[in-house]
């Protein structure tokens, strides 16, 4: 599952044009959450307290981040210890090197 900085970190990476994103879309979940424990310490809940805005005033919350190269890891390959997303990311980097 992707949440919060699993959205914020790749968003900054793409927004700053540091490189290309490889993987699957990330739901827009970029807020700061305050975690509270109730009287029963097994009950914990999070309350969003800060939303992150772009220069145009729109919020990152509910704004899905799309990768440049969309590729999923299937359960069948994951149980074999294979990472299709990582392999694709390395292939994309090698293409960039070959261009130079």
Question: Model-flagged regions — what are they?
Answer:
Residues 1-100:
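C-terminal "post-core" interaction segments
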């Amino acid at each position: 599952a992707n949440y919060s900085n699993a959205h914020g970190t790749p968003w900054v990476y793409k927004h700053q044009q540091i490189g290309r994103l490889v993987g699957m879309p990330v739901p827009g979940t970029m807020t700061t959450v305050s975690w509270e424990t109730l009287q029963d310490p097994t009950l914990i809940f999070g309350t969003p307290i800060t939303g992150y805005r772009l220069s145009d005033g729109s919020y990152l919350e509910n704004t899905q981040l799309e990768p440049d190269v969309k590729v999923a890891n299937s359960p069948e390959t994951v149980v074999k210890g294979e990472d299709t997303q990582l392999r694709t990311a390395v292939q994309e980097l090698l293409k960039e090197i070959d261009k130079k």
